[in-house]
Every structure is written in C-alpha cells, then in structure tokens.
Amino acid sequence: MGLPILAIIVLGMCGSVQKISDHVNKKFYTVMIGAIMILCCCVSIPRTAAVGIEMGLQGIWPGAPYLVFVILYFVIAFLFAKDRGTALDKVGKILTPIMTIILFILVVKGAVSPIGTPGAASVDNAFVNSFLGGYSTGDVLVSFLAAGVFFDSIKRKAYEGEAFRKAHVRACLIAAVCLAIVYGGLLYMGACVSTEYTPDSISNANLLLAIIRSSGGQIAIYGLCLSVVLACLTTAISQITAVADFYETATHGKLSYKVLVMIVPIVTTIVASFGLDTIVSLTSPWFSFFYPITLVMTILGIFEKKIPNDGAFKGAVYFTVIYAVLDLPHEYGFGFLDPVLNHIPLYGPVSYTHLRAHET
C-alpha cells in the first residue's frame, strides 16, 4: 500500500520518471519503461480483467460466461480511456467514489460489529511475506508507468511549480489515508477469524469471501464483488491510458493515442482469454525482475538532491539489474544459476521464491 504512493510522491518531487531515469542513462527510461509497458499489456492489464471477472463477477454469478465479460470489460475500459484528457477525471468522479463508499461501509461494519476476537499470528515472517507479496501485485511498477498520466491530469487543471507539488502530495496523502482505512479494516476483520482458519485450510480469495459473508451476509458479498470489479476496472483504464500515451511519445506520433488506445484493449483481451492461473504462472517471475529495479530507483529518488553524482544511481541500478537477470531463471524453476545466487548476501532468507516455497 505505502510503496506505490511513496513512488508517486518521489517521482513527482523529481519531476518525472524520465528525469530520475536520466541519472542512470539517457536511454534507460525508454528501455525500462518500454519493457514495463509490454509487461503491462501482457500481464497487468489482462490480469485486472481475470481477477475482476473470476473473483468479482463470478463470485455472485458463478455461471457468468468468462470470455463474453472479458470483451465487455475491455469495451468499457476503452470507452473511459479513449479521451486522454478526461480519462482519469471520469474514473475519479464516477468509479472510484462508488468503490470507496462500498469498501468503507464493509470495513466500518466489520469494525463496529466484529465477527470474532483477534487471535495469535499464524504466519511466520508476516512482514517480509507481505512485503515480497507486493512483487506479484506489481503496484510499484504501476506507479512508474502511470505517474506521467497522473501528473498530466493535475497539470491540465493549471497546477504548475509549487502548486503542482502541493496538489500531487495532497492527492497522495488522501489516497494513503483511504487505503489505510480500507486495508486496516480488512486486516482487523481477518485477525478476528484467525482462530477459525489457517493459511493451509483456505485460499486467500475464499477467506475474504468468508469474512465478508460472516460480517454482512449476501448483500455484503454483492458489495465486495462490485468493488473488486470497479477496482480492477479503474486500474485497467489508467494503465491503458499510460501505455497508449507512452508509445505515442516513443514513436514520435507515428502511432497516435487514438489508434493505440484501441490496439491495447484488443491485445489484452486476447491475453486475458487464457484465464488468471495461466497468466500468473507464466508471467509472475517478470514482476520479480522489474520490481527490485523500480524499488531501488524510488529509494534513490528520495535522496536525489543529496546524492552528489550519477555514479550512485548507475551502480545501484546496474547491480540490481544483474541480480534480477540472475534470479529470473530461478523464478521459472531452472536452477543452473543457483550456485551464483547462493553467494549473494541475504538471497536465501528473503528471496521471493524462498518465501513462496514455504507458503506452499
């Protein structure tokens, strides 16, 4: 929750993703963000549809035809994203308020009328597990690819200079408070049933459904499923907008935004048709490849004005890239580089693959 918002704040303070990337190499921005945009088209955006339909729509309508609703999902996303200037405004005025109100009602109900008593923790290394679990969500990656669209939306409202910085930090703080309330409420509700369920006895999705059903009955389930769909849809719209905007700039206008904003939903519809499990199994390792790089750049960005030269940026990012390249085959189950990886300090105890193996 905190890292994506921190990344947006840092990128805004530095000016843009490109400005912070230029400390590494003038071409690094195009290469890295271009690769993340491809990952976004092949993984992140299709996954929003798969999650929204499988966990949202099919949660209340198990027989819902998957492919039909994938197509409908991306048609709706296209209709919101087709106008670059108003895409985020429409999301902020229509979809996000509905989703936020529903989630607030659910967590307030769960906090006011708890369904049990919080028990002892049943997961070892909860913080590290949760932190590295962010790899598979790719939230910081989304911050890097959507930051430009977010900043452009603020500047279109005539915020410049110091006014822009204040507006963007204010927006991030409001988002942080809202997310803290929602996630804090869900964490408390989860703790209240910790004596009834163990991590091995139920999946995360079914656990969430069980908690919400116990708290508010079937009506609460409808609310949860609707909020899941809306959360996924808002994410898809912002990412489609970001991808189309980036490649219009990267191709120097040879591919227009209007053309790209139609191509992206078509590509993502095809990928999403394979289903959530296939998407995750084939592409999750790429999140663990890019996530450390963007995380290092976020940390460096915090101290940008204190770092005397670009050498620190180059050294930190290049060594992180080397580590990510070495770790990628391991994420796919190939162990031929394990002897090298095992000599990297802290690789074993805190690696994403290591912790994931202990969860299964």
Regions found by a protein language model. Give the residues of each.
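Membrane helical hairpin/interfacial module
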Residues: 2-63
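Inter-helical loop and helix-membrane interface segments of multi-pass membrane transporters/permeases
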Residues: 45-69, 113-135, 328-348
